[in-house]
Amino acid sequence: MIHQPPAGARDLLPLEVAQKGWINDCLQQVFQRWGYQRIVTSTIEWLDTLMAGGAIERSTVIQLQDTSEGTLGLRPELTASIARTAVSRMADSTYPQRICYRANVFRNPPPGYHGRQLEFYQAGVELLFAGGLLADGEILLLVADCLETLGLTDWHLILGEAGLTRSLLSVFPDPLRQQVRHCLAHLDYITLENLTYPSADLRERALLLFDLRGNPADVLSKVASLELEESDRIIVNNFKSLIHLIEQSHPNPLPLILDLSLVQTFDYYTGLVFKVVSSSDNQLRVLGQGGRYDQLLGLYHPQHQSAPGIGFSLNLEDLHLCLLSTSSSGMPRQIPVIDWLVIAQTTQSQVAAFNYAQLLRNSNTLVRVALDLGGRSPEEIRDYARTCRIKTLVWIGEDGTPRIETVQ
């Protein structure tokens, strides 16, 4: 089996690398324009770090061999690792920390899905030690800026509120509450409808939660009709203020959907949660996800001091697939071509060929220069150049004199 990658792994060839590199570069430029600094965390972490106090299922983590000090794992996402880093290396900061990243993550597939992809690529940001309306608004507007910079148009921003959803779920007894939550997280209406409920009222409440999605004003009107605690009414009012803020702060109407049944797979979120979805090419893709996690940093603090945080990650694979079907995108459709091919015509001119190629490479602008490695006739070299879209050949004669030829 050494001639194949393991199940769930895949190789990226030059064109895909160039395209995903372009996506990453665009996103990093947007992050930097908003004042975010890149961080690099370890791919390998202690399993306890990665599980974020139980918010991330142990089965999700690809685990490595136990050591004498504990079990290691490959990160299934970046937020927990960045939270650990922030608490251990940036804990003295009382001002907001704006952090961005581009990295790979690893996840075990669900049971029964052998062969599903294990390694994923993400780019994202974390806004740490900052809470409140302005921080939430900054993150949502930054998401929109990222998607617009990439040239994507057919997308929606789905908003939810983890605290309010937990409150609405609190009427269900355990373990039914976990079953309802799982159905909401995976949009499994059939299973939700057929769960065993202690009363018809609870069944009706579960189905109502599933349907709390749509135009923000309409959904908030439905929620207002429910019997809510005072703390929940404050959340609803804050949500109204947030939606007003981002709608007034963006030059064009944002494609917002309010979905109070939205439950993220990772359970460390405490406030605003959101997903970015696209329906291009008649396929629904999740382009990104994020939310507020005001208790997570406290898990890694020696005195368990909490600090607010909010962030998001964008999924490079899904962004790439959407951009492939978007003709207006600036993503490259071909690998960069070689600008110059330098050919030593004799053994005596090989040193001169290397020197001339290096002279071309020393240009102030990026110039791609390759050296012909011999063994081909002049016509075979020209055929190769046409196939590879090489525009210019440089023939180095025996005396070291270059002769430039434009390929027709």
Swiss-Prot record:
Family matches, as HAMAP family: HisZ
Family that this chain belongs to: Belongs to the class-II aminoacyl-tRNA synthetase family. HisZ subfamily.
Keywords: Amino-acid biosynthesis, Cytoplasm, Histidine biosynthesis
Gene: hisZ
CDD domains membership: HisRS-like_core
Source organism of this protein record: Gloeothece citriformis (strain PCC 7424) (Cyanothece sp. (strain PCC 7424))
Main location: cytoplasm
Further comment: This function is generally fulfilled by the C-terminal part of HisG, which is missing in some bacteria such as this one.
Protein name per the record: ATP phosphoribosyltransferase regulatory subunit
